Amino acid sequence: NSHMAAMAASKLTGALPAISGASLTGIVTGKVLQVVTAHSGTQATSTSDTYADSGLTGQITPSSTSSKVLVLISQSISKDGATYANIRVYRGSTEIGGAVAGRSIGYTNGSIHNYVGTGFSMAFQDSPSSTSAVTYKTQFNNSSATGTVRVQVDSGQSYMTLLEIAG
């Protein structure tokens, strides 16, 4: 292409800016510092609209108060009867995600029945602002208190992965 030939480096004149990556060596935000995984295969059952622990719990100790924690959850859950199942997530005693908090965690719909298993996949970022051990857990309920909701039904596994991200 004649236009490209006209742009040959030999035709450039004057001082060109120099770019150095040396000043970027101190940037560490966004780096994964540690990964912790947890799982549960212990079945828990609910016929109540009161939230209860699902048995899925993970713990991570951030290295800095500026670190973020990426929380990834795959919660095994099933129900029978005309009800809905809700999942919510806690850091210690503080709700950080779930149906009540209005985060992007849903519920099973009324068409799932006869012990057909489904699951919730959840991903969200938390800012614990701590260098002490931080515990995350899921809770579940049976929203209409009819039928039965089960997590880890028949020893099906639920998983939690916690990634510390440099802040």
In which residue ranges do the predicted regions lie?
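Terminal beta-strand-rich extracellular "head" domains
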Residues: 39, 43-45, 50, 61-133, ...
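Residue-level signal for the start and early helices of compact helical domains
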Residues: 3, 7-10, 15, 27-29, ...
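Extended, low-complexity regulatory regions
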Residues: 56-58
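Glycine-rich, low-complexity segments
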Residues: 1-43, 167
